[in-house]
């Protein structure tokens, strides 16, 4: 009889999703090894160039995923985060308008630094998890279940001597690393996904939007409490239809700003003078707070990023490979669900492994196909597919809402309708999450806003949130048609009142 051994999983990518996956499977009793191309983020001297500066918005789905692995991690992250209770819309005339995310329940999303989130998650991994940084996946031999890597190695290892790029050499991993399961958590340009597509028929699509993003920053100002020159408990938006600027608060009183602008418009801002005129015309309040020089210096030196939607189906192959996070479903950032969805992938996978009674040990030879694990991974891919398609669609929809629709009277009217109907026809309380069932609320009853379902209801799948919103939108449209037939006068008075408020605000 074959001897029992722990299952061996190789996780490629030590970002937030990869680190949580490693901790989750370690807690389940698997033998875990993690490869990461970048430097170890745990050291204080971690290279800033290896730490993406963009802030992350973590909400209920992400927090619930963290709690499912270790409740203390979620609470520790909340201490590092800044709650944001709504959007603060900055109009061109300088007026500001608060739009609460949850006007009835008062729930918030949370701004947290990506480097801090990543460092804390990697720091939470025990010594039993084998971490290999500066390790780049070269190729995977799926026939023999072996992965090969190249490594950056230091030629000088004297104590206290700083590492330099020119002291690093790439060396090939000649022996390779055998595995039972390889998990690709290596982002939008996943090498694990590329290897899987060579081994199996996988549908893959990618679509770029015409906008670039550029990271800017608003320094802390000691003249204000805590250094915050703007309300720290809002996500700040300067919507300008074709483009927009957003700002998320940091713990030190600064704000991380991101400009989203069409490449075609960006090409016209080819001089410092033209860029200065652009910011003064469209974002005068931001220029006043940040300072023109700081804003323009950031604009000139910081890279232009692409925004892409990626879908991959199926996301699993046999019992040997699966994709999580951006490797499977990269999305544009306008719903703030990229991180939350990726972390939720980990919770859903763990739930399905539990449901299929996948033991952390096996008597199969290392790399041998496991029919039971294959069924579990297929179940994950099949069940998750609809939700991933839905959130990618919703993120694209919110791309238009944030830069344009938030300025529309119809947007304000719909928010008021949601508030009234939510009060009159309250949805059932959030169902308790189960280890065996990731989304216990199969059908949302009553009335609740799309934003609440997506952001604050981890018991509801994204596809159900989209289905419910389509139904509610039809109800609002039908009610509006009936109102137009039987209550033209009343509707006219209401419309005039809304228009008056709109004009006063503008």
Curated annotation (Swiss-Prot):
Positions of the UniProt region annotated as Disordered: 153-174
GO molecular-function terms, A-Z: FAD binding; kynurenine 3-monooxygenase activity; NAD(P)H oxidase H2O2-forming activity
Domain of life of the organism encoding this protein: Eukaryota
InterPro entries reported for this sequence: FAD-bd (IPR002938), FAD/NAD-bd_sf (IPR036188), Kynurenine_monooxygenase (IPR027545)
Keyword ATP-binding among record annotations: no
UniProt feature, compositional bias: Basic and acidic residues: 162-171
Record key words, sorted: FAD, Flavoprotein, Membrane, Mitochondrion, Mitochondrion outer membrane, Monooxygenase, NADP, Oxidoreductase, Pyridine nucleotide biosynthesis
Cofactor(s) this protein requires: FAD
Enzyme Commission number(s): 1.14.13.9
Pathway stated in the Swiss-Prot or TrEMBL entry: Cofactor biosynthesis; NAD(+) biosynthesis; quinolinate from L-kynurenine: step 1/3
Pfam short name (any one): FAD_binding_3
GO biological process entries: 'de novo' NAD biosynthetic process from L-tryptophan; anthranilate metabolic process; kynurenine metabolic process; L-tryptophan catabolic process; quinolinate biosynthetic process
One cellular component (GO) term of this entry: peroxisome
Cellular compartment(s): Mitochondrion outer membrane
Reaction equation(s) it catalyzes: L-kynurenine + NADPH + O2 + H(+) = 3-hydroxy-L-kynurenine + NADP(+) + H2O
Keyword Cytoplasm attributed: no
The family this protein is said to belong to: Belongs to the aromatic-ring hydroxylase family. KMO subfamily.
Main function: Catalyzes the hydroxylation of L-kynurenine (L-Kyn) to form 3-hydroxy-L-kynurenine (L-3OHKyn). Required for synthesis of quinolinic acid.
Name of this chain's protein: Kynurenine 3-monooxygenase
Record gene name: BNA4
